[in-house]
């Protein structure tokens, strides 16, 4: 039951068992109710419910046999009937709450009302109108490659922003990003700074309750300089270091030598005359849009379960990012390229630069991660983002626990045994409002575990 009293927490609950390795297939099987399409009612439906003028999205699976209706509504098992074009069912949650649906189906569209009854407050049910359509199917044919030159850059991860390009699962997009200050590869400032993003990209068939898969096939430099800072952010300072750093907040320009694969200071001090760092291009921002019901639209410097300004230095060429879909089309944003960055983005700005980017998208239908998951050739990584390092640590741990439970059907005790012996933690972000902590597990440790589907 999606309790009305805690709707915005529970309606985005995790349902993502069946996610497979980046090297395997991502076409996760839909539940049996969606596969059995023996009537105009059976299938996977996307519901748009009207909560006091705000759209809230759900998924439900229906199976009709001889007038009897079974399936699930947002994870709650349902039973009901079909009489002509009229459907009626009741779904029940583990706490005893219910969702009662009465609707009609006409020309492939369902409409009607839901009555939500909270087990803790049964005397005050709430009634909401809805419409629903069968979940869209993947487009047939060969995946396309798109060349996209951005002309508009948004500074919010909003579901209201107009998509710049529509793509299908399996498609690849080649594009560019400006740097965090809004400057492009030619040194031309195109937009006000503040992590302006390329996108959003509308991904066909991606619906709330799905997982968006973003494979970064190319993250390359497209200019030879970057801007950073010479200070340390407040989370990294104690009293004595803070006093030493009080006058240190000026910009520092770096030279990017792609041929040698290193970055050096353009005007180094005597002690740093021979100092260099390896180039490791990354994207600070990869995000899907939060839902229309979000209390506030996050700016492009913010982060959360939708991804956003994660500033995680493993979001590099070859990485795959899994993000929850919370609005139709997912609305994918990318930006904030860094030529190199230490853990935490300790200076406040990394080596900020524009970037040449190519990515491929996919959709895992009916399964959703609770927050960003990053996969490399060697590790699976759960990103936790919250207001303090302690809270981000908890988020990363919970996200990985959910992933292990869903993928391998582990019990809580088994999850604890795996995490207690295999977890590797990194502080990924300390520069912005939310801190970031990442829990990594080497994938070799997990190879002996049977997946949930195999069980």
Task: Describe every region a protein language model picked out.
Residues 149-158, 190-197, 298-306:
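Short, structured beta-strand/loop micro-motifs enriched in basic residues and often containing a Trp
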Residues 167, 203-206, 315:
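Short, well-ordered loop/turn sites that connect or cap secondary structure elements
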Residues 6-21:
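Bacterial N-terminal signal peptides
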Residues 28-122, 126:
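Central antiparallel beta-sheet cores of small beta-barrel/beta-sandwich binding domains
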Residues 211-365, 405, 412-413, 418-436, ...:
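Glycine-rich anion/phosphate-binding loop at the beta-strand->alpha-helix junction
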Residues 140-189:
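N-terminal, Lys/Arg-enriched amphipathic/low-complexity engagement segments
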Residues 18-31:
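Signal peptide processing junction and immediate N-terminal pro/mature segment
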Residues 371-388, 392-401:
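Extended amphipathic ligand-handling, pore-lining, and cofactor/metal-binding catalytic surfaces
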């Amino acid at each position: 039951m999606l309790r009305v009293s805690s709707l915005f927490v529970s309606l985005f609950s995790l349902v993502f068992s069946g996610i497979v390795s980046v090297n395997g297939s991502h076409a996760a099987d839909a539940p049996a109710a969606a596969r059995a399409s023996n009537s105009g009612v059976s299938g996977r439906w996307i519901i748009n419910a009207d909560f006091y003028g705000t759209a809230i999205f759900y998924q439900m699976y229906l199976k009709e046999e001889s007038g009897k209706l079974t399936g699930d509504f947002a994870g709650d098992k349902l039973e009901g009937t079909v009489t002509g074009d009229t459907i009626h069912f009741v779904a029940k949650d583990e706490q005893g709450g219910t969702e009662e649906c009465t609707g009609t189906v006409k020309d492939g569209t369902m409409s009607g009302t839901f009555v939500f009854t909270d087990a803790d407050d049964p005397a005050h049910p709430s009634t909401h109108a809805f419409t629903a359509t069968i979940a869209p199917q993947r487009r047939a044919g060969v995946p396309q490659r798109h060349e996209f030159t951005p002309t508009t850059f948004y500074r919010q991860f909003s579901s209201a922003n107009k998509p710049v390009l529509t793509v299908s699962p399996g498609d690849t997009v080649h594009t560019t990003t400006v740097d965090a200050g809004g400057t492009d590869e030619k040194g031309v400032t195109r937009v006000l700074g503040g992590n302006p993003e390329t996108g959003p990209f509308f991904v066909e068939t991606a619906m709330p309750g799905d997982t968006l898969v973003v494979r970064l096939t190319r993250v390359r430099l497209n200019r030879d300089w970057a801007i950073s800072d010479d200070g340390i952010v407040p989370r990294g300072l104690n009293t004595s270091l803070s006093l030493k750093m009080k006058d240190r907040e000026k910009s520092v320009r770096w030279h990017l030598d792609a041929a040698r694969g290193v970055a050096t200071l353009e005007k180094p001090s005597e002690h740093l005359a021979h100092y260099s760092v390896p180039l490791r291009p990354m994207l600070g921002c990869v995000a899907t849009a939060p839902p229309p019901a979000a209390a506030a639209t996050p700016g492009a410097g913010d982060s959360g379960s939708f991804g956003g300004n994660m500033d995680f230095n493993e979001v590099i060429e070859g990485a795959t990012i899994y993000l929850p879909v919370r609005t139709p089309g997912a609305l994918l944003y990318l930006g904030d390229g860094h030529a190199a960055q230490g853990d935490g983005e300790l200076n406040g700005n990394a080596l900020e630069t524009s970037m040449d980017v190519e990515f491929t998208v996919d959709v895992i239908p009916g399964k959703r991660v609770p927050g960003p998951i990053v996969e490399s050739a060697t590790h699976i990584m759960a990103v936790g983002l919250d207001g303090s390092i302690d809270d981000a640590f908890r988020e990363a741990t919970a996200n990985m626990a959910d992933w292990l439970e869903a993928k391998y059907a582990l019990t809580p005790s088994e999850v604890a045994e795996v995490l207690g012996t295999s977890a590797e933690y990194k502080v990924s972000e300390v520069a912005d409002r939310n801190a970031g902590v990442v829990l990594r597990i080497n994938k070799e440790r997990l190879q002996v575990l049977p997946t949930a589907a195999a069980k």
